Regions:
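Hydrophobic transmembrane alpha-helices of multi-pass small-molecule transport proteins
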Residues: 56-77, 125-128, 180, 189
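Specific transmembrane alpha-helical segments of multi-pass solute transporters/efflux pumps
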Residues: 2-33, 37, 73, 152-170
Length: 194
């Protein structure tokens, strides 16, 4: 029998991330969504670092300010008459809050594989409930379900386990800055494949 000790913050963070991420991309393109997501994650992790009395370095602040200016410029001027980008922005900020919480929680993980597995197991009912409450009118095929399981449940879980393995060795501000590579990768891959 495998004993699974779940962590409430890990489950909460992963649930917010998955639900916000899923619904946010109905309104946003991949590159813009990832910029909002990881810019927001940076704010959450910087705030956590400051609140825990670990002051960011000058280099950290420069990176943070540059990222925030980039996000503001990306969305300026913002069309307040269109609800679609605002919905996407709000949902992606919810995902950012969730991933920030999940990442901060990972800095304390003693067993990354077990932590990730228990977080996924306890997140599944929350995510399924959100799909029932907010159906998104998609058609499911067996092949599509298979691909979702392979990419989402298996590959993401392995990636999240790796992230939880690395996190204890990084300062929160460095972990936040490292994640700013994701939007660049997402933009490049979306230009190639989408």
């Amino acid at each position: 029998v495998i004993y699974i000790k779940h962590n409430l913050l890990g489950v909460l963070g992963l649930s917010l991330y998955m639900v916000g991420f899923h619904y946010g991309y109905f309104f946003l393109e991949a590159g813009i969504g990832s910029i909002i997501l990881f810019g927001g994650v940076q704010v959450v992790m910087f705030t956590s670092s400051i609140l825990s009395k670990k002051q960011p370095t000058l280099f950290n602040w420069i990176g943070m300010i540059a990222a925030m200016i980039g996000i503001i410029l990306l969305f300026f001027p913002f069309d307040l008459n269109s609800s679609q980008p605002i919905n996407g922005l709000i949902l992606m900020l919810i995902a950012a809050l969730g991933w920030g919480i999940y990442s901060i929680n990972g800095t304390k993980s003693k067993n990354p594989l077990t932590s990730t597995m228990s977080n996924f197991i306890f997140t599944i009912p929350i995510v399924i409930t959100s799909f029932i409450i907010f159906p998104d009118n998609i058609s499911l095929t067996y092949f599509g379900i298979f691909l979702a399981i392979c990419s989402g449940a298996i590959m993401s879980a392995l990636g999240y386990s790796l992230w939880y393995t690395i996190l204890p060795y990084l300062e929160k501000t460095i972990a936040a800055l490292v994640q700013l590579l994701v939007p660049v990768i997402a933009l490049a891959l979306s230009m190639l494949f989408l």
